[in-house]
Curated annotation (Swiss-Prot):
InterPro entries, A to Z: BPD_transp_1_N, MetI-like, MetI-like_sf, Opp2B
Gene Ontology MF annotations: nickel cation transmembrane transporter activity
Protein name: Nickel import system permease protein NikB
Gene3D superfamilies found in the cross-reference section: MetI-like
Superkingdom field: Bacteria
Gene Ontology cellular component terms for the protein in this record: plasma membrane
Residues in the signal sequence: none
CDD domains cross-referenced by the UniProt entry: TM_PBP2
Recorded topology in the membrane: Multi-pass membrane protein
NCBIfam families tied to this protein: Opp2B (NF045470)
Listed PANTHER family: DIPEPTIDE TRANSPORT SYSTEM PERMEASE PROTEIN DPPB-RELATED
Length: 328
């Protein structure tokens, strides 16, 4: 019962946040400089008649009150109608569908690559605590966090194009962007896996398994892997959301036709409907992904369910991730 209530609460919270994002996107359009009528007509106001201007305003609903305009905006949004681009005259929804796949592909590929690299390295760092491999992994993680993604991207692009003289579209528009975004994300996951595993290695469950004569591989797979990975799920939700924002810089650096590239191009041309669409896409994606991550954590983590079922024990059953910083 408590789980159902918690799921409903998170879903309602998601709807409220999406509503706020939609309203902010509407306000952004109204506060933006310039007149959309001028942009649509592609003419100076002095060169068009008053009838043309008024007809365009009526078509856009600009003569209505702000409240009525907001109501029409929300109604159109529910029907996936974001208007048309000032530049190409195409529906904004269709433009987003054309540009979104590459952004989503890069983001999810970055997530997979980061997990495949960081979980094994985090386990190695914890199992070889304070040894050379642990120190090397920690130094690399610190450098990855310290360096901005665009700086890493510039270095990789220089190495591949100038020093190695490799000219490949797949390399420059997929492999390098994924590698650039993965380095920073790997650092956080490695530190979290290492910290959680160091705590678990001292737990009674591990000690009991060793007393029963179980080998280290069995202990790692059956006793340590699940509780080590569970705290990563909320971090993945946050990281995947931030990856979408990070692609704004990376896509422009590597000239990738994704949402980030579209957003910057629309800002330059003051194509406000497309800007609205990009902001809504990024905002909706971040909120939905974080909600899914919260629900997965709730369903998979028994400690979360125990706390929901007995709120009085909330302070007595801390999550691993809450004390992980002391062992970092």
């Amino acid at each position: 019962m408590f789980i159902i209530k918690s799921i409903l609460y998170r879903l309602i919270q998601m709807i409220v946040v999406l509503f706020v994002i939609s309203t902010l996107a509407f306000i952004l359009m109204k506060l933006s400089p310039g007149n959309p009528v001028d942009k649509i007509l592609h003419l100076d106001v002095a060169q068009v008649s008053t009838e043309q201007i008024n007809a365009t305003k009526d078509k856009l609903g600009l003569n209505d009150s702000l409240l009525v305009q907001w109501w029409h905006w929300m109604n159109h949004l529910l029907h996936f109608n974001l208007g048309k681009s000032f530049e190409s005259k195409e529906p904004v929804t269709q433009i987003l569908f054309n540009y979104a796949p590459i952004t989503l592909l890069i983001s999810f590929s970055t997530l997979v690559v980061s997990l495949c690299i960081s979980i094994p390295l985090g386990i190695i760092a914890a199992k070889r605590f304070h040894k050379l491999s642990d120190k090397v992994i920690r130094v690399i993680s610190t450098l990855s966090i310290s360096l901005p993604a665009f700086f890493i991207g510039i270095i990789l692009l220089f190495i591949v194009t100038n020093l190695m003289n490799i000219d490949s579209v797949i390399l420059s528009q997929f492999i390098l962007p994924v590698l650039t975004l993965s380095l920073g994300m790997c650092a956080y996951i490695i530190r979290l896996v290492r910290s959680n595993l160091l705590i678990l290695l001292k737990s009674n469950i591990v000690q009991a398994s060793r007393l029963r004569g179980m080998n280290e591989r069995y202990i790692l797979i059956h006793d340590l892997l699940k509780p080590t990975i569970l705290p990563i799920i909320p971090l993945l939700g946050i990281s995947l959301g931030s990856l979408i924002g990070g692609t704004v810089v990376i896509e422009n650096l590597f000239d990738i036709p994704g949402i980030g590239y579209l957003l910057m191009d629309s800002i330059k041309s003051r194509d406000y409907p497309v800007i609205q669409g990009c902001v809504l896409f990024i905002g909706f994606f971040v909120v939905i992904i974080n909600t899914i991550a919260d629900l997965l954590t709730l369903l998979l983590d028994p400690k979360q369910r125990l706390q929901l079922g007995n709120p009085k024990n909330k302070t007595n059953t801390p999550l691993i991730s809450e004390s992980s910083d002391r062992h970092a």
